[in-house]
């Protein structure tokens, strides 16, 4: 979230799209209801199903799964055509006025630079025109034909209300009503908050779904505002912490990037990741990248990391390609993987194409599962009839189960959707042989060191040089790790005026104190300030709220620097006055920025060219994404890889995302509409949490049996009655479940045909105390978003028959 949960109450419009907050986030949804009840907010829901969120909405609009970009691009067109934008915000705070290269183009579904053989783009044309000083050229009149504003207008001009209705199946009147209400928040004293979740991310255009919404917020002037923002409702407790700490194949903590094999030395790595300002006098905060990186290396390797050895740069692995789950399991399938560590995850139930996952795991020599509970992954080799019809005798994978603790059995912090780090304390000791994850990893670390010391080996420096200065080396404590994340002064630190800001050995209070000379250490720069010499800020529990905005700066701690709303400089106009005084976050008092949040802007006075989007080299919000996105600098509608239309009404020659993450062997497992005529989409229920709570008896009682949902019209066509057992199949396999026939799903008229949707809850499997069921991801396709590689769980093709 750029904002936070409580801030939702400040919105005038709450738009829930790509998520189902009332059911998947029932506690957090209270703030949407608070906005309705106490701020007279309008709640809008756009969803393929009429959900519990929709049941309390003021406006509900149905949509075909996988067509969100068409809907949102139609909103962009409406705002532009009807001049329903915050014009001053767009002019000064976005890149609308910057000029784009003359060789950038878009034609027939493809942007300039496409290489059909490699299925990727040369993005060099997706950039600005630069002057002799290296700064992007600008036309503040917005009349130049190559300015972002005019290119955007031309790009979205195709997304008329009729086109939206034809592709999305959303009735035109419903779409226009949504546009009208959203447009009302272009006024400076009104805001919209967008709430989304996996319903947007789990598509082959997932990242572009979110970007399109962010573009709407920029046009409306809602970024940086109380009651505004781009707000992801995280699907797991602490999944925000996972991304913060960089637990991805090409990432490092604090959203730093793991070096690639092309970056052969530290200099080339830092040059590739340290941007230069592209407009004069910008904060360009990523220019501090070397400070964050060197401090990370000092935390990783301690005294072993020195300037003379480039801070241990050579000890980091260098990636040759992205090892996402789609790629890695294909490597397993090809016999290129010997062993697999699975920590706190259940791939057999969570990854797409479950039958392929089981086949891949069967080719391993060994697998280690670290989890508090028995998972389908840990018992994938067992035969459970139709739901897991394997031959145990033919599977030679050796499975090691290491029981771990759950959150209630350990101290630590949880990072919520709003970036708040909240400390929690152990409720009870772990049962039996269970150990916490830190203790398990410490045991592996020490045993590996002992083996290398005894037997020798090559390439051992990353392990042997690692800093491991815990009081109990075999059982690191949560507070020690938290302090490492925060960071220390390794020498006395002085500011530019010679004033001492931290003594050697003291905890740091700000990432502004990090240095690139080896005098500071921090494992995660964005967490600096979370545990200072004044104590554990994550344990703060003062919920006083003098502003009434819900920022509660004394409750827990939010990164960065306890700031509750990112880019809050944008909440004030170019003169430093709040767009809406009633929702003032920060303002200029004549000498500094002050207010109801931690300012993100230093002391740059109003009237200077410094833009509010401090992480961007141009200081502006990007309506044109220059060279960042895989499939284009503007969003474009591409059909799901399994489309019920068999074409793309906008450009039949480019049906689906042209740079989608799809391997040849997986392409053979994609279905066609002739055999699988209905859209399948997966989702969660309030009564269960993924595949975890089927181990809990009360949850199993609340939702005891696997079911799927279909419309009354589809049920009539297929001769299915409510409560019948049905078989749902895709090109990859089948599941059996009870049919729930409901009016909450309806057919949509799309491109001259009726499109039906089959709703598939995800929570069942063959482990736990709940009734045994089939794994929903038996049906889903092994294809991913080109940016995040997230699989397409939300739009695929199925058939359904009475069992």
Residue ranges with predicted function:
Residues 92-96, 181-182, 197-199, 229-240, ...:
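A glycine-rich phosphate-binding loop feature that marks nucleotide/adenosyl-phosphate handling sites
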Residues 163-170, 196-204, 235-237, 344-349:
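Conserved short loop/turn motifs at secondary-structure junctions
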Residues 50-54, 67-71, 78, 374-378, ...:
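Short gly/pro/ser/thr-enriched loop/turn and capping motifs at secondary-structure boundaries
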Residues 55-63, 378-380, 387, 403, ...:
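Short beta-alpha connecting loops at secondary-structure transitions
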Residues 439-492, 496-497, 589, 596-598, ...:
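Long, contiguous, secondary-structure-rich segments that constitute the structural scaffold
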Residues 1-34, 41-44, 70, 218-410, ...:
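Extended redox/cofactor-interaction regions of prokaryotic respiratory oxidoreductases
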Residues 5, 397-429, 741, 762:
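Glycine/threonine-rich phosphate-binding loop and adjacent beta-strand/alpha-helix elements that clamp
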Residues 51-188, 283-284, 441:
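Long, well-ordered, tryptophan-enriched scaffold segments
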């Amino acid at each position: 979230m750029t904002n936070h949960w409580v801030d939702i109450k400040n919105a005038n419009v709450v738009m829930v799209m790509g998520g189902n907050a009332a059911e998947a986030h029932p506690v957090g949804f209270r703030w949407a209801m608070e906005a309705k009840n106490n701020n007279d907010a309008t709640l809008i829901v756009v969803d393929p199903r009429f959900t519990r969120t929709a049941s309390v909405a003021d406006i509900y609009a149905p949509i075909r799964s996988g067509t969100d970009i068409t809907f949102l691009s139609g909103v962009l067109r409406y705002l532009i055509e009807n001049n329903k934008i915050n014009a001053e915000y767009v002019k000064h705070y976005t890149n609308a006025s910057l000029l784009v290269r003359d060789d950038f183009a878009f034609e027939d579904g493809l942007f300039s630079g496409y290489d059909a053989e490699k299925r990727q783009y040369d993005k060099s044309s997706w950039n600005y025109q630069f002057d002799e000083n290296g700064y992007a050229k600008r036309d503040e009149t917005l009349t130049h034909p190559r300015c972002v504003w005019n290119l955007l207008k031309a790009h979205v001009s195709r997304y008329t209300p009729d086109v939206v209705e034809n592709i999305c199946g959303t009735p035109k009147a419903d779409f226009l009503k949504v546009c009208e209400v959203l447009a009302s928040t272009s006024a400076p004293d009104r805001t919209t908050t967008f709430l989304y979740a996996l319903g947007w991310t789990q598509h082959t255009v997932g990242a572009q779904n979110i970007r399109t919404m962010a573009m709407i917020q920029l046009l409306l002037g809602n970024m940086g505002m109380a009651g505004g923002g781009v707000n992801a409702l995280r699907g797991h407790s602490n999944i925000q912490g996972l991304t913060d700490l960089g637990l991805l194949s090409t990432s490092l903590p604090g959203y730093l990037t793991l070096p690639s094999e092309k970056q052969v030395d530290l200099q080339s790595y830092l040059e590739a990741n340290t941007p230069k300002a592209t407009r004069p006098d910008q904060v360009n905060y990523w220019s501090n990248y070397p400070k964050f990186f060197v401090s990370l290396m000092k935390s990783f390797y301690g005294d072993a990391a020195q300037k003379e050895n480039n801070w241990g740069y050579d000890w980091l692995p260098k990636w040759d390609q992205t090892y996402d789950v789609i790629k890695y399991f294909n490597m397993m399938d090809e016999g290129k993987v010997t062993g697999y560590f699975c920590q706190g995850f259940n791939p057999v139930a969570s990854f797409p194409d479950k039958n392929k996952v089981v086949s891949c795991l069967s080719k391993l020599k060994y697998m280690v599962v670290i989890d508090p509970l028995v998972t389908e992954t840990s018992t994938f080799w067992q035969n459970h009839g139709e739901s897991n019809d394997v031959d145990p005798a033919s599977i030679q994978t050796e499975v090691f189960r290491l029981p771990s603790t759950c959150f209630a059995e350990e101290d630590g912090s949880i990072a919520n959707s709003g970036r708040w780090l909240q400390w929690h304390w152990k409720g009870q000791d772990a049962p039996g042989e269970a150990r916490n994850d830190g203790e398990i990893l410490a045991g592996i670390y020490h045993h590996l060191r002992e083996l290398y010391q005894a037997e020798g080996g090559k390439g051992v420096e990353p392990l042997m040089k690692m800093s491991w200065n815990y009081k109990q080396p075999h059982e690191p404590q949560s507070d020690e790790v938290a302090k490492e994340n925060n960071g220390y002064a390794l020498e006395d630190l002085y500011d530019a005026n010679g004033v001492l800001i931290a003594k050697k050995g003291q905890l740091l209070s700000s990432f502004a104190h990090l240095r690139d000379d080896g005098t500071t250490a921090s494992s995660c720069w964005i967490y600096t300030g979370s545990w200072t010499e004044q104590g554990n800020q994550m344990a703060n529990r003062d919920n006083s709220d003098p502003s009434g905005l819900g920022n509660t700066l004394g409750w827990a701690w939010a990164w960065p620097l306890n700031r509750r709303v990112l880019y809050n400089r944008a909440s004030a106009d170019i003169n430093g006055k709040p767009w809406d005084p009633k929702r003032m976050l920060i303002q200029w008092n004549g000498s500094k920025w002050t207010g109801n949040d931690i300012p993100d802007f230093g002391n740059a006075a109003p009237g200077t060219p410094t833009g509010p989007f401090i992480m961007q080299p141009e200081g502006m919000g990007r309506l044109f994404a220059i060279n960042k996105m895989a499939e284009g600098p503007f969003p474009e509608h591409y059909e799901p890889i399994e489309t019920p239309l068999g074409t793309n009404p906008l450009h039949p020659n480019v049906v689906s995302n042209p740079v989608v993450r799809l391997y040849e062997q997986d392409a053979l497992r994609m279905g066609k509409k002739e055999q699988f005529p209905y859209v399948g989409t997966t989702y969660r229920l309030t009564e269960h949490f993924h595949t975890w709570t089927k181990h809990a008896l009360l949850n199993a009682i609340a939702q005891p049996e696997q079911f799927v949902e279909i419309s009354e019209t589809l049920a009539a066509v297929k001769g299915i009655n409510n409560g019948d057992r049905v078989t749902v199949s895709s090109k990859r396999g089948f599941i059996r479940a009870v049919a729930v026939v409901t009016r909450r799903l309806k057919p949509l008229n799309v491109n001259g045909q009726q499109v039906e949707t089959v709703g598939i809850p995800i929570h069942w499997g063959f482990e736990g105390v709940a009734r045994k069921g089939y794994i929903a991801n038996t049906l889903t396709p092994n294809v991913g978003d080109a940016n995040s590689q997230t699989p397409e769980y939300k739009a695929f093709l199925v058939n359904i028959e009475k069992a």
